[in-house]
């Protein structure tokens, strides 16, 4: 998952994740060296040093004694650096200072852009606005990250204040039409645009699109209404997410009706001979897969999928406000407004994709349901069809009867081969083979990290030049979010000579990247801020920490997924921050992370790293085969239905963000039943008036874009099959370079369809390069590719 900021962002449309950093650091077992803050950092390229780095990478995560020694300062300096080596963030007061200094720089840039009149001014305008975007992101992203992840309440409060100051200023920019007018003037002048680089032209289009979506072109009265609607929407969203509740809190049934359910759980819920089954939390799910009595399952199913009327009103108000906002901005619907800068472009194209995908998935669904119906008929010979409240129950029954591998001793031994250190080591080895980069464990300076458990990894290339910095905060702790997330802390960007001079004029101690990581590109001799990212996970540790943290298969794929986002940030080292790293179309950004899930368990990749944490023995071949058979068994029994559930949610999302919310008798429940009765293999019974949509929290964060994850899964399935040959080329350098050069290195600087077309080349699916144009037929073609055996977890 990428962290998405819920803010309008003409400057950082895809500030879709959060944050950044620098200053020279020292390596383990090496003394500190006095390095210029602007000099390029390199590490030793000797074979022995690389082997030591590889071993150290594993040990800093797996060995607590080794980590304690490694993380001890190797010099006597008592001076503390700032968080992420940001020179302002040495304490809570530094957040406001950082925001104020950045704000002053922003104001100067805005004044310069508004006053622009010469060709030289207009030719430099995109870079000026990109720097404005970067200055805003530096503060907002950093503050948002620390607000969510720093354990100190004082730091959290200070970060909140800094965030509020810059967010308020961003709202001022969103009501400054002169910026939009000046950029339009520059973009319309061939004497200007002929001097722009391809990146500058893309960034200009992105910025103009963001201006249009903030309704900056509207008359003042309409613009005020747009801001008011936006504020209402921003308040309704969290209210909808945090108030999901059923219309009826409990279903009361006789104890004997719950046979099959865990007796200890029944006892907790029992009152005399009756049991009050709550309709929230995990209990309904547990009941649906374990209770033998069909009528009881039906009652629990229907009741648990019926939202409170208040919650439905909240949703309908939210959808109506979004539709009004889009209409005010000149779009037919909220979906049209949201999708205009995505690969899909239109809601019609999204529906084409989803219907084609549903058709390609239907055969598997019917096979699954036929097997489950046979199980039901063994229990109830007169049964002629499977009901929606039967599905979980008979999947569970099938698993209990057939999935011996799951219950075998062998499956319980698998995590011992996937310690976190072993997996990180494997990721580094994989990246070396695919992209010629590796992860180097690096000592942090006092004050640099927000928690003692955070590890810093530098990413270096084959010339041992540093490319990026990754902070790994992977272990659970009190009050930490359980959601795995990739945060962009600072994106790639060229730092101009003017910025360097500006810092020197202000103070000899100031750094043009606030003290965070920089490098000099040898090809151009220009200074760049390095991509800096954080990976947040919530993996358990043993209480004594005497044994390493071991990952099950789900957590293994999660770590590979998040590292897929990270490598996208690392390799998309653009000149402009606006299009750096993961700042690309929402329906393209998950491709690198989704495809990484396939690498996690590919036999060729497992051979690189899967070793027992204690004996160092490689994962036996028969266990590799068992993993694959178990995965195929899961997918063959409910993978198709899992896919259909996601497809239906995406179709419902499109229906809700059409123009229908503006109709006088808009009824979200009727639309829900229309969509499901048309497309579902197991629709809710007619007349049930279930209203599951009240639980659909992703409507808030992914309004009109819920299809994106499915879309990227379909593309990833095709790429894995055709480029990486289903895993045969999963460690092949040519295949890796192809993926890097056609997809990863561009960030948001190349249209996603061109990336896909370039990647597939002469593949029949891309006959005559037809995918490069995108459009409704291209969306339908991707739907035909299907989802394969890839992960089926939702967003």
UniProtKB/Swiss-Prot annotation:
Task: Provide the binding site for Zn(2+).
Answer: 561, 565, 568
Matching entries from Gene3D superfamilies are given as: Collagenase (Catalytic Domain) (3.40.390.10), Neurolysin, domain 3 (1.10.1370.10)
User: Which major enzyme category is it?
Assistant: hydrolase
Report the sequence similarity comment from the record.
Belongs to the peptidase M3 family.
Q: Which UniProt keywords apply?
A: Hydrolase, Metal-binding, Metalloprotease, Mitochondrion, Protease, Transit peptide, Zinc
Recorded catalytic reaction(s): these are: Release of an N-terminal octapeptide as second stage of processing of some proteins imported into the mitochondrion
Q: Which residues does the Swiss-Prot or TrEMBL record annotate as the active site?
A: 562
Can you say what this protein is called? Mitochondrial intermediate peptidase
- Look up the EC number in the record and give it: 3.4.24.59
Q: What is its main location?
A: mitochondrion
**Keyword Mitochondrion (UniProt):** yes
Note on how the cofactor is bound: Binds 1 zinc ion.
Q: Name one Pfam family in it.
A: Peptidase_M3
Which BP terms does GO give this entry? peptide metabolic process; protein processing involved in protein targeting to mitochondrion
Matching SUPFAM superfamilies? Metalloproteases ('zincins'), catalytic domain
What GO MF annotations does this protein's record show? metal ion binding; metalloendopeptidase activity
Instruction: Please give the organism.
Output: Coccidioides immitis (strain RS)
Q: What does this protein do?
A: Cleaves proteins, imported into the mitochondrion, to their mature size. While most mitochondrial precursor proteins are processed to the mature form in one step by mitochondrial processing peptidase (MPP), the sequential cleavage by MIP of an octapeptide after initial processing by MPP is a required step for a subgroup of nuclear-encoded precursor proteins destined for the matrix or the inner membrane.
Where is this protein's transit peptide?
A: 1-22
Task: Give the PANTHER family listed for this entry.
Answer: MITOCHONDRIAL INTERMEDIATE PEPTIDASE, PROTEASE M3 THIMET OLIGOPEPTIDASE-RELATED
Protein localization: Mitochondrion matrix
């Amino acid at each position: 998952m990428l962290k998405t900021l819920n803010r309008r962002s003409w400057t950082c449309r895809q500030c879709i994740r959060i944050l950044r950093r620098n200053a020279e650091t020292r390596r383990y077992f090496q003394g500190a060296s006095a390095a210029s803050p602007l000099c390029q950092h390199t590490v030793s390229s000797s074979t022995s040093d690389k082997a030591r780095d590889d071993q150290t990478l594993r040990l800093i995560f797996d060995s607590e004694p080794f980590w304690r020694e490694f993380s001890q300062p190797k010099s006597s300096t008592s001076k503390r650096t700032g968080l992420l080596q940001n020179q302002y963030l040495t304490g809570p007061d530094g957040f406001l200072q950082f925001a104020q200094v950045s704000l002053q720089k922003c104001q100067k840039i805005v004044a310069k852009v508004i006053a622009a009149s010469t060709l030289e001014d207009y030719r430099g305008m995109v870079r000026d606005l990109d720097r404005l975007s970067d200055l805003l992101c530096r503060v907002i992203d950093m503050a948002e990250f620390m607000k969510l992840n720093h354990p100190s309440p004082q730091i959290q409060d200070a970060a909140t204040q800094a965030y509020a100051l810059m967010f308020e200023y961003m709202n001022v920019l969103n009501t400054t039409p002169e910026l939009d007018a000046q950029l339009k003037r520059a973009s319309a002048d061939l004497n200007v645009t002929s001097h722009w680089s391809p990146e500058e032209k893309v960034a200009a289009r992105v910025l103009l699109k963001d201006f249009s979506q903030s309704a900056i072109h509207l008359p003042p009265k309409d613009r005020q209404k747009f801001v008011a609607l936006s504020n209402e929407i921003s308040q309704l969203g969290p209210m909808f997410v945090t108030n999901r509740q059923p219309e009826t809190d409990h279903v009361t049934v006789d104890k004997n009706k719950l046979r099959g359910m865990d007796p200890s759980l029944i006892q907790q819920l029992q009152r005399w001979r009756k049991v009050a089954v709550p309709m929230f939390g995990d209990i309904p799910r547990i009941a649906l897969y374990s209770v033998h009595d069909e009528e009881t399952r039906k009652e629990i199913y229907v009741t648990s999928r019926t939202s409170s009327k208040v919650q439905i009103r909240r949703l309908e108000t939210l959808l109506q406000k979004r539709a009004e906002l889009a209409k005010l901005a000149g779009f037919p619907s909220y979906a049209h407004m949201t999708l205009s800068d995505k690969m899909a472009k239109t809601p019609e194209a999204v529906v084409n994709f989803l219907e084609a995908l549903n058709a390609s998935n239907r055969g598997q669904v019917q096979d699954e349901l036929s097997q489950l119906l046979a199980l039901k008929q063994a229990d109830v010979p007169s049964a002629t069809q499977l009901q929606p409240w039967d599905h979980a129950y008979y999947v569970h029954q099938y698993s209990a009867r057939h999935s011996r591998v799951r219950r075998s001793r062998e499956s319980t031994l698998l995590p011992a081969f996937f310690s976190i250190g072993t997996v990180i080591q494997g990721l580094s080895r994989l990246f070396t083979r695919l992209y010629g980069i590796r992860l180097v464990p690096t000592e942090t300076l006092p004050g640099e990290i927000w928690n003692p458990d955070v590890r810093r990894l530098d990413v270096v290339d084959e010339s041992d030049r540093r490319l990026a910095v990754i902070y790994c905060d992977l272990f659970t702790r009190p009050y930490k979010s359980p959601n795995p997330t990739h945060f962009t802390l600072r994106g790639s960007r060229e730092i101009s000579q003017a910025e360097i001079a500006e810092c020197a004029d202000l103070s000899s101690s100031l750094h043009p990247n606030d003290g965070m990581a920089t490098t000099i590109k040898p090809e151009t001799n220009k200074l760049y801020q390095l991509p800096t990212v954080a990976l947040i996970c919530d993996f358990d540790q043993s209480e004594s920490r005497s044994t390493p943290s071991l990952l099950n298969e789900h957590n293994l794929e999660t770590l590979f997924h998040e590292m897929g986002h990270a490598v996208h940030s690392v390799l998309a080292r653009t000149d402009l921050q606006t299009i750096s790293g993961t700042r690309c179309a929402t329906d393209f950004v998950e491709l690198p992370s989704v495809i990484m899930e396939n690498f996690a368990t590919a036999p060729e990749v497992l051979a690189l790293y899967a070793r027992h944490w204690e004996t160092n023995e490689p994962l036996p071949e028969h266990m590799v085969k068992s993993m694959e058979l178990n995965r195929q068994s899961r997918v063959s029994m409910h993978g198709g239905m899992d896919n259909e559930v996601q497809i239906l949610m995406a179709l419902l999302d499109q229906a809700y963000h059409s123009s229908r919310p503006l109709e006088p008798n808009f009824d979200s429940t009727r639309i829900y039943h229309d969509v499901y009765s048309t497309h579902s293999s197991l629709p809710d019974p007619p007349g049930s008036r279930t209203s599951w949509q009240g639980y659909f929290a992703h409507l808030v964060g992914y309004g009109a874009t819920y299809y994106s994850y499915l879309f990227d899964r379909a593309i990833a399935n095709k790429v894995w099959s055709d480029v990486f040959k289903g895993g045969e080329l999963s460690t092949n350098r040519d295949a890796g370079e192809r993926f890097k050069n056609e997809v990863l290195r561009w960030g948001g600087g190349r249209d996603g369809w061109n990336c896909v077309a370039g990647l597939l080349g002469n593949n029949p699916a891309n006959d005559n390069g037809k995918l490069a144009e995108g459009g409704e037929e291209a969306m339908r073609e991707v739907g035909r590719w299907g989802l394969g055996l890839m992960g089926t977890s939702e967003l």
